[in-house]
Amino acid sequence: MSMNRQEISDLCVKSLEGRMVGTEAQNIENGNAFYRYFFTNFPDLRVYFKGAEKYTADDVKKSERFDKQGQRILLACHLLANVYTNEEVFKGYVRETINRHRIYKMDPALWMAFFTVFTGYLESVGCLNDQQKAAWMALGKEFNAESQTHLKNSNLPHV
Protein backbone atom coordinates (compact mmCIF):
# COMPACT_ATOMS: atom_id res chain seq x y z
CA MET A 1 0.00 0.00 0.00
CA SER A 2 1.40 3.35 -1.02
CA MET A 3 0.81 6.31 1.27
CA ASN A 4 1.20 10.00 0.61
CA ARG A 5 3.02 12.39 2.95
CA GLN A 6 -0.17 13.48 4.71
CA GLU A 7 -1.26 9.90 5.38
CA ILE A 8 2.18 9.00 6.70
CA SER A 9 2.22 12.07 8.94
CA ASP A 10 -1.29 11.42 10.25
CA LEU A 11 -0.51 7.79 11.09
CA CYS A 12 2.75 8.64 12.82
CA VAL A 13 1.15 11.47 14.82
CA LYS A 14 -1.70 9.17 15.87
CA SER A 15 0.76 6.53 17.08
CA LEU A 16 2.33 9.09 19.42
CA GLU A 17 -0.87 10.13 21.19
CA GLY A 18 -0.07 7.84 24.10
CA ARG A 19 3.57 8.95 24.24
CA MET A 20 3.31 12.69 24.76
CA VAL A 21 6.10 14.95 25.94
CA GLY A 22 5.71 17.30 28.88
CA THR A 23 6.51 17.96 32.49
CA GLU A 24 3.94 15.68 34.14
CA ALA A 25 5.18 12.42 35.67
CA GLN A 26 3.54 10.31 32.94
CA ASN A 27 5.19 12.37 30.22
CA ILE A 28 8.61 11.93 31.83
CA GLU A 29 7.90 8.20 32.15
CA ASN A 30 7.03 8.00 28.45
CA GLY A 31 10.52 9.12 27.43
CA ASN A 32 12.41 7.22 30.11
CA ALA A 33 10.56 4.05 29.09
CA PHE A 34 11.97 4.37 25.56
CA TYR A 35 15.51 4.23 26.91
CA ARG A 36 14.71 1.32 29.21
CA TYR A 37 13.44 -0.54 26.14
CA PHE A 38 16.49 0.56 24.15
CA PHE A 39 19.08 -0.45 26.77
CA THR A 40 17.37 -3.80 27.36
CA ASN A 41 16.89 -4.80 23.72
CA PHE A 42 19.92 -3.15 22.06
CA PRO A 43 22.70 -3.31 24.67
CA ASP A 44 25.41 -3.11 22.00
CA LEU A 45 24.32 0.48 21.27
CA ARG A 46 24.95 1.66 24.83
CA VAL A 47 28.49 2.55 23.70
CA TYR A 48 27.03 5.78 22.29
CA PHE A 49 26.00 6.89 25.80
CA LYS A 50 29.24 7.86 27.52
CA GLY A 51 29.13 7.01 31.19
CA ALA A 52 26.10 4.76 30.76
CA GLU A 53 27.68 1.94 28.76
CA LYS A 54 26.88 -0.60 31.47
CA TYR A 55 23.47 0.76 32.49
CA THR A 56 20.58 -1.62 32.97
CA ALA A 57 16.92 -0.72 32.59
CA ASP A 58 16.81 -0.15 36.37
CA ASP A 59 19.71 2.30 36.13
CA VAL A 60 17.94 4.14 33.32
CA LYS A 61 14.70 4.30 35.32
CA LYS A 62 16.49 6.12 38.16
CA SER A 63 18.44 8.44 35.87
CA GLU A 64 17.58 12.11 35.51
CA ARG A 65 19.80 12.09 32.42
CA PHE A 66 17.47 9.62 30.71
CA ASP A 67 14.37 11.45 31.93
CA LYS A 68 15.68 14.46 29.98
CA GLN A 69 17.03 12.43 27.06
CA GLY A 70 13.69 10.64 26.81
CA GLN A 71 11.90 13.95 26.44
CA ARG A 72 14.34 15.00 23.72
CA ILE A 73 13.88 11.80 21.70
CA LEU A 74 10.10 11.89 21.99
CA LEU A 75 10.06 15.57 21.03
CA ALA A 76 12.23 14.78 18.01
CA CYS A 77 9.83 12.03 16.92
CA HIS A 78 6.81 14.28 17.42
CA LEU A 79 8.52 16.95 15.33
CA LEU A 80 9.40 14.50 12.56
CA ALA A 81 5.83 13.21 12.40
CA ASN A 82 4.32 16.70 12.47
CA VAL A 83 6.61 18.34 9.89
CA TYR A 84 6.72 15.41 7.47
CA THR A 85 4.17 17.02 5.15
CA ASN A 86 6.58 19.92 4.57
CA GLU A 87 9.39 18.14 2.75
CA GLU A 88 11.96 20.94 2.95
CA VAL A 89 11.38 21.54 6.67
CA PHE A 90 11.54 17.78 7.27
CA LYS A 91 14.84 17.50 5.40
CA GLY A 92 16.20 20.56 7.19
CA TYR A 93 15.36 19.00 10.54
CA VAL A 94 17.05 15.75 9.47
CA ARG A 95 20.23 17.63 8.56
CA GLU A 96 20.17 19.53 11.85
CA THR A 97 19.75 16.25 13.72
CA ILE A 98 22.78 14.81 11.92
CA ASN A 99 24.81 17.91 12.74
CA ARG A 100 23.97 17.62 16.46
CA HIS A 101 25.07 13.97 16.48
CA ARG A 102 28.41 14.35 14.64
CA ILE A 103 30.39 14.40 17.87
CA TYR A 104 29.24 10.87 18.68
CA LYS A 105 30.78 9.38 15.51
CA MET A 106 27.78 7.12 15.03
CA ASP A 107 27.73 4.30 12.54
CA PRO A 108 25.78 5.80 9.60
CA ALA A 109 23.66 2.64 9.35
CA LEU A 110 22.11 3.53 12.70
CA TRP A 111 19.99 6.32 11.20
CA MET A 112 17.67 3.79 9.58
CA ALA A 113 18.05 1.31 12.42
CA PHE A 114 16.63 3.89 14.82
CA PHE A 115 13.19 3.50 13.28
CA THR A 116 13.24 -0.25 13.87
CA VAL A 117 14.11 0.45 17.51
CA PHE A 118 11.48 3.18 17.87
CA THR A 119 8.67 1.19 16.27
CA GLY A 120 9.65 -1.78 18.44
CA TYR A 121 9.28 0.44 21.49
CA LEU A 122 5.88 1.74 20.34
CA GLU A 123 4.75 -1.85 19.72
CA SER A 124 5.97 -2.90 23.16
CA VAL A 125 3.74 -0.31 24.85
CA GLY A 126 0.72 -1.00 22.63
CA CYS A 127 0.87 2.25 20.66
CA LEU A 128 1.36 0.90 17.15
CA ASN A 129 -0.65 -0.98 14.56
CA ASP A 130 0.68 -2.41 11.28
CA GLN A 131 -0.35 0.61 9.22
CA GLN A 132 1.32 3.02 11.65
CA LYS A 133 4.46 0.89 11.65
CA ALA A 134 4.56 1.02 7.85
CA ALA A 135 4.17 4.80 8.05
CA TRP A 136 7.06 5.14 10.50
CA MET A 137 9.24 2.93 8.32
CA ALA A 138 8.40 5.04 5.24
CA LEU A 139 9.26 8.19 7.19
CA GLY A 140 12.43 6.49 8.42
CA LYS A 141 13.44 5.52 4.89
CA GLU A 142 13.24 9.15 3.82
CA PHE A 143 14.98 10.29 7.02
CA ASN A 144 17.80 7.86 6.26
CA ALA A 145 18.08 8.93 2.62
CA GLU A 146 18.47 12.58 3.62
CA SER A 147 20.86 11.58 6.42
CA GLN A 148 23.13 9.68 4.06
CA THR A 149 23.06 12.51 1.50
CA HIS A 150 23.95 15.05 4.17
CA LEU A 151 26.71 12.85 5.59
CA LYS A 152 28.17 12.37 2.10
CA ASN A 153 27.94 16.10 1.33
CA SER A 154 29.68 16.78 4.66
CA ASN A 155 32.52 14.38 3.80
CA LEU A 156 31.52 12.08 6.66
CA PRO A 157 31.10 8.30 6.64
CA HIS A 158 27.84 7.25 4.97
CA VAL A 159 26.19 4.15 3.54
UniProtKB/Swiss-Prot annotation:
Source taxon at top rank: Eukaryota
Domain Globin: 1-152
Swiss-Prot/TrEMBL keywords: Cytoplasm, Heme, Iron, Metal-binding, Oxygen transport, Transport
Location relative to the cell: Cytoplasm
Chain coiled-coil ranges: none
Tissues expressing this chain: Expressed mainly in a subset of neuronal cells and in head muscular tissue.
Induction entry: By hypoxia.
An annotated GO cellular component: cytoplasm
Molecular function as annotated in GO: heme binding; iron ion binding; oxygen binding; oxygen carrier activity
A Pfam family annotated for this UniProt entry: Globin
Assembly and oligomerization: Homodimer.
Similarity-based family: Belongs to the globin family.
Protein name (database record): Globin-like protein
